[in-house]
Amino acid sequence: MNKIQDELELVLPTPEYKTQVEEYLQEFFDNGEYEIAGDGGLDRIKNFEEWLLKVQKDLSEESIEDNRIPATLYLTVRKSDNRVVGNLQIRHKLNEKLLQYGGHIGDSVRPSERRKGYASWMLNN
């Protein structure tokens, strides 16, 4: 197993990650970045509990908001310090907009953790 594989894991968001997710979001804003790819709307909603509920609803076509498509969002967490270093969203099908501009996968890595191979790892796992 490579070093990055040993360092990281993909996890579904849960209430236990509230502080880590809020710090993750704030780092983007502090870096002047106000749009986060594949974040399930975190950059717009900004409230963890509301965002978590939306992410959970997004899992199923029966509970998703109108004009949305089912998607699974994962947090990329570094095991050694439980730090959220990225996010990965897998969209289970595409609508017209996503066919043109988004695709099946959206991902981001927090600014201070870039250029470490984390995005490549997320896409390969």
Could you say what each language-model-derived stretch is?
Residues 1-104, 111:
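GNAT-family acyltransferases
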Residues 106-109, 115-125:
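Conserved acetyl-CoA-binding loop-helix of GNAT-fold acetyltransferases
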